Amino acid sequence: MLAKMSFMQNVKNIQEVDVNHKRVLIRVDFNVPLDENLNITDDTRIRESLPTIQFCIDNKAKDIILVSHLGRPKGVEEKLSLKPFLKRLERLLNHEVVFSQNIAQLKQALNENAPTRIFLLENIRFLKGEEENDENLAKDLASLCDVFVNDAFGTSHRKHASTYGTAKFAPIKVSGFLLKKEIDSFYQAFNHPLRPLLLIVGGAKVSSKLTLLKNILDLIDKLIIAGAMSNTFLKALGYDVQDSSVEDALINDALELLQSAKEKKVKVYLPIDAVTTDDILNPKHIKISPVQDIEPKHKIADIGPASLKLFSEVIESAPTILWNGPLGVHEKQEFARGTTFLAHKIANTYAFSLIGGGDTIDAINRAGEKDNMSFISTGGGASLELLEGKILPCFEVLDKRH
């Protein structure tokens, strides 16, 4: 894993190339959450892209073209347009931003002579061929720039036209400051970390994190498994989790993982009690029970107070902490205590804390602890693949130092 991260660290960064009077296309990640009125509820990803954009402004790039996706549109969907982002961008950058409906309109605007201009292209996923890594679309985007900058860590594990494809055909292709910061932070967590190194994994499914867990056992010392995915492990150990969500097909995989952890001397912690309910969406009865005594027809919705105490003690002894996935159904206030408590606990330690996953970040924001974590990764799937020991495809096509 470290060798692969080192390979990705060898990618050239924007500060190593001359952008003066150059046309720069930056693949940013503005895939941010919106409310029902299409207002941005968390602009973290937009703010994280600002240093790269500002660098281009300060170094007098001729034109700066921002390309991003938003959501998973099927064709053109007005509710997923990037046009409403203009005002937020202009306020954050203190600079005018011009919206381009399509590539043809953008090309026409680029022909006009003017001092440094910033363009925001409409949601790139509105264009057919983006997710298929269409070569013609990639070449079209690459033709717009002298320098291509990938600053979208969250999509760097996907071979899309605006990330992987454009980099292949651009004359100069480098990483932005955010991309560099992401890789450097992951490398810091695993290259001679202060030990014990603790990994906390939560979330709904074992299947989404099984590869991660198998590959990372050689690097960690302690492992907390919580969230709905822990139900599968509890059932594998013989506990009756009643109506709780379980991936029965992965019972044997869970047992094998626990055995592998034992052989590698990784201490594994599972919940010892739980907050359960008759109905997660409309709870009428909520109860705290030991995991060996779950109420019939109840579902596990959060970890209980005894588990919180146990996990707190583990966290207090860990100088390096990685966390991916909530510990319960944190979207509902009744079942958010475990995740919120954990966020406060990690924030109040001296540990180097690296946080990944959209749900985890959302929970940390709700807890008001965003500024108290060492590093919050902007990538969900990308950070998981990195932890699984993979080289993210989009790094392969960027220019290397040597």
UniProtKB/Swiss-Prot annotation:
One GO process term, biological-process aspect:
glycolytic process
Q: Which GO terms describe its cellular component?
A: cytosol
The cross-references to InterPro entries, in alphabetical order and at most eight, read:
Phosphoglycerate_kinase, Phosphoglycerate_kinase_CS, Phosphoglycerate_kinase_N, Phosphoglycerate_kinase_sf
Q: Principal place where this protein is found?
A: cytoplasm
Residue positions binding ATP: K209, E331, G357, G358, D359, T360
Reactions performed catalytically: (2R)-3-phosphoglycerate + ATP = (2R)-3-phospho-glyceroyl phosphate + ADP
Q: Where in the cell?
A: Cytoplasm
| Top-rank taxon | Bacteria
Keywords assigned: ATP-binding, Cytoplasm, Glycolysis, Kinase, Nucleotide-binding, Transferase
Does the UniProt entry include the keyword Lyase?
Answer: no
Residues bound to substrate are D29, F30, N31, R45, H69, L70, G71, R72, R125, R158
Q: What is its EC number?
A: 2.7.2.3
Q: Name one GO molecular function term.
A: ADP binding
Q: Which Pfam families match?
A: PGK (PF00162)
Entry's family note: Belongs to the phosphoglycerate kinase family.
- For this entry, the protein name equals Phosphoglycerate kinase
The organism encoding this protein is Helicobacter pylori (strain J99 / ATCC 700824) (Campylobacter pylori J99)
**Phylogenetic placement of the source organism:** Bacteria, Pseudomonadati, Campylobacterota, Epsilonproteobacteria, Campylobacterales
Q: Gene encoding this chain?
A: pgk
